[in-house]
Amino acid sequence: VNEAPDYVIGSIGAGSHFGGLIAPFVPARIQGRDTRFVAVEEASTPSLTRGVYTEESADAAGLMPQVPMYTLGREYAPPGVLAGAMRYHGVAPIVSALYREKHISAVAHGQIESYSAGLMFTRAEGIVLSPLAMYTVKEVIEQALRCKETGSDDTILFTVTPAVSTDSTPYDSLLDGLLHDEKAEEASLKKSLGRFIGRI
């Protein structure tokens, strides 16, 4: 379409999907273009918005080499949420470095608001979204409403991934009033991050 995005928005767990989404636009951003990259986290696993930048193992058992990342610590036990891919304790090194250098911003949304946004999108577009995509759509709607209020004509780029099965659990849980937001497990968070005292 020969048009550069003003916003690139995507959900983030470990960072592979989000990193791939923003990668083509990173050089221009580093060279001065004001493209805003927004990573959307699950509120119960806020690796960027509440984590620390340190070296940590990529796996929970600590068998893999330690790499620099934003992390909640491999010992952090996140609550069970339907978007399982967003429960990882850390963020990929390259994405973490870009966040550290303030090329990326991050927000955290809960299940109910994200799934409600996803349901709205599904009803409007006819696409049954994956749980991860619902978080993206939630933030996209927030930014679109901001544009409407300010009269901005910002171009927003985002990706949505369709549900890979006929599992209707997210929608059933939302419509039946059974879905609830999970918060970060404070005790587990404090214990896990406590391992890094003196290292950050």
Give names to the regions the model predicted.
Residues 1-34:
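Glycine-rich ThDP/TPP pyrophosphate-binding loop and its adjacent helix/strand module
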Residues 6, 104, 154:
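Conserved acidic residues
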